[in-house]
Amino acid sequence: MPDGFQLGPIFIRFYGIILMSGALAGGWLAAREAKRREYDPEIVWDLLIWLIIGGVVGARLWHVFTPSPSAIAEGRTTIFYLTHPFDLINIRNGGLGIPGAVIGGIIALFFYTRRHGLNFAEWTDISAPALALGQAIGRWGNFFNQELYGAPTNLPWKIYIDPQHRLPGFESQAYYHPLFLYESLWDLANMALLIWLMRRYGERFKSGDIFLVYLIVYPVGRFFLDFLRLDASQLGGINANQTFVAVVAVLSALALLWRHREEIGRN
């Protein structure tokens, strides 16, 4: 499967095009929500630049510090990246972790809103559905890179993986679960839920609640999907991403309950 095309002296990868498309689609959705809340939509496009920078840096660092077993087998360990600066910043072939992207984006958003006198919590709400949409689109970059596929399967929606992209021990297996597709669909459902909650029950939510819902829904889906993942990052024998998202989901649920404890008590 081709993973890009030649444009003069430059090889353009579909992975990068799709990631940028996801960012722009997310920006469009966030701009609509900002306008609905009577903010200047141009704020979103100015902010988006910083979110992309923060997200990419965070995503790369997450990958560097939680390398997958296949990356480690190829010698691309944390120490390798830290001692090879060019490889550290080379993301043309992937190597980005969504948990790190979210963390990096949150940090960038915090400093941007603080600098411009905006309500950080409210802007996390504005950004949440857009983030889910961006993830849903961005996951298709994994399709062209032939990565983030699940266990072997013969289900009708199985995907073929070229031999050079199959993991060690699975060389004879040709068809796999399209794990990227499952996560993309989950992200779309998350986006739809967040938009519905904002429009239907917006007056009941406090600033930051919608983002907390995002931090519950996405991690729950990611937690269960990771059981199908063949090349999950390990730290001390523990699935790093699965453990992290489980902790985030629990803490976010507790935070949401705590913020509405008085209403819950009255009911």
Regions found by a protein language model. Give the residues of each.
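Hydrophobic, membrane-interfacing alpha helices
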Residues: 1-267
